[in-house]
Swiss-Prot record:
Belongs to the RecR family. This is Recombination protein RecR. Residues 79-174 form the Toprim domain. GO terms for biological process: DNA recombination; DNA repair. The keyword Iron-sulfur does not apply. The lineage of its organism: Bacteria, Pseudomonadati, Thermodesulfobacteriota, Desulfuromonadia, Geobacterales. A zinc finger (C4-type) spans 57-72. One of its GO terms (molecular function) is DNA binding. It comes from Geobacter sp. (strain M21). Keywords: DNA damage, DNA recombination, DNA repair, Metal-binding, Zinc, Zinc-finger. The gene is recR.
Amino acid sequence: MLHFSGSLTRLVGELKKLPGVGEKSALRLAFHLLKHPNNIEALAQSLLQVGERVHLCSVCFAITEDDPCWICSGERDSGTICVVEEPQDLMALERSRAFGGRYHVLQGALSPLNGVTPKDLRIAELMQRLQGGEVREVLIATNFTVEGEATALYLTRMIKPLSIKVTRLAHGIPVGSDLEYVDAATVQRAVEGRSEL
């Protein structure tokens, strides 16, 4: 990187830590902020507020400012739980308006090659939620990646002995894709066409 002031170099370094932001993008963002100094304070304030106020729901582990979150505390169908990898997957399903139950966010997917085991995910908490007898169906909505499929298979093996119906999103979602990037109509078709495992 060219030599800039320490402050600008630090800003670019922090921006590069964001997913999908390389050095050129980080520089472009930094220079944009410098051109619009009024935005700097608003951005800094928003970042601080997110850090202070946003946390995981103690029930489903979605991102929320309230505990429990609005989905867990609302009048949704508590007999169906949709299991997703990340909070942004939950948001994609909510955008489709195809699912009326509750969620459980694993905070990742199994990946033995990367050292991610069941203990690293919110699987134990999911199994605890299923013990009450209220849940009739678990919809597994992990991504259609190697890790997502491994997670779905593992969850199916854990849940089936509980005599709870286990379903999987239909394969209308392209293999190798993340729910976060799929349009709402495709997600809706996938939810409606889910199949039992």
